[in-house]
Amino acid sequence: MSALKFWVWLTEQNRLGGPARQALLEHFGSPEEVYYAEPGDLLRVEGITADQAQALEKKSLDRAQSILEECARKDIFLLTAQDALYPQRLKNIYDPPLLLYGRGSMPLFDEEAAVAVVGTRSCSPYGIRTAERFGFEMSKQGGLVVSGLARGIDAASQLGALRAGGLTAAVLGCGVDVVYPPENDRLYEDVAASGVLLSEYPPGAEPFGWHFPARNRILSGLCLATLVVEAPEKSGALITAATALEQGRDVFAIPGPLDAEGSVGCNRLIRDGAGLATESWDILREYQSRYPHKLHPDGEKLPPLPKKSEIFYPERSKKPKVASSGLPVINVRRNAEGLTDDQIKVLRILDDKEPMLTDDIALRANVPVRRILSAVTMLEIDGYTRQEGLRKFVRTVEVEDTKE
């Protein structure tokens, strides 16, 4: 019988809090030993009540088996607290999750300069631009951007990391198969393809409000620092910052106008001792001596964004030249659009009729898949490509490759 089944069984014991599960695991050594323990032995564990011991007498593994089967169907991996890939940083926090569900590729968090980027969902255009810039530049400088995939600041920072072709991770307050909020569906898929989606909740778990404060301890616990981009006085981002401080992590904040509601929380954090960040290197320089082979201050800067950019589909103000085919023309030699080298390679390879898999594009371009995913994401945002099925894209512009 798979040992994972017992891990799922233990984490699904709703009468037990995280500390109680942790105490049982430390006492018995494994969830399987907890499963087979006698009631009298359970009661010898400090903090375990008679009611909790009685609840553990329910030995059905049907729910656990169902969850494992669903994970297999949906390509979801499980990471236990005893797994070699489980981050030591997370083990060291109060109430570490015994089990993580994931989609994508799990980074070695202990070897990464990971920074949690958080802020209000009801953010200003300035907050969006700033979060995207920090996400982009932090990735270019070798950092790992971690966020919660919420609308607003979270989404903008992760979009910035994807634009940079960097790794990114999201910690969810629902199952990793649940897209929340729904408008982040493409961003959700791109994060899973370029990094990892993580949750302590099983597949299908809904985004209940009480999940998110619990999620925040994982978000900050995986990281060396938490950056608050924009936060009103009672923002949930301030809860994440407080949790980070309790975990002994660094906290940074971006200053804002004194009369801006979204800057009240950030300015207060700075007043109370948080690090002031006006550029991403203000944060990453703190960890350069620890990760000299990864972190460098000369990363590429994000090109200027329009004042009122949309996160996903900015409107284009100029009417482009139109080819006889009816498609807009993009001259990749002049590159007035400021495309990256990877984006230009993608446009040269893609067809305007036959969809091509990102894996095939990467093979032809001789570029890693995660960089191709970043390139096609940004090209789609700009309206130069269109997704046709799972990770298949077509070009929606005519490519001109001349100097004139």
Label for each model-derived stretch:
Residues 1-85, 384, 389-391, 399-404:
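Short, small/acidic-rich helices and loops at N termini and domain boundaries
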Residues 2-4, 72-73, 80-404:
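Glycine-biased, small-residue-rich flexible motifs in mid-sequence functional cores and linkers
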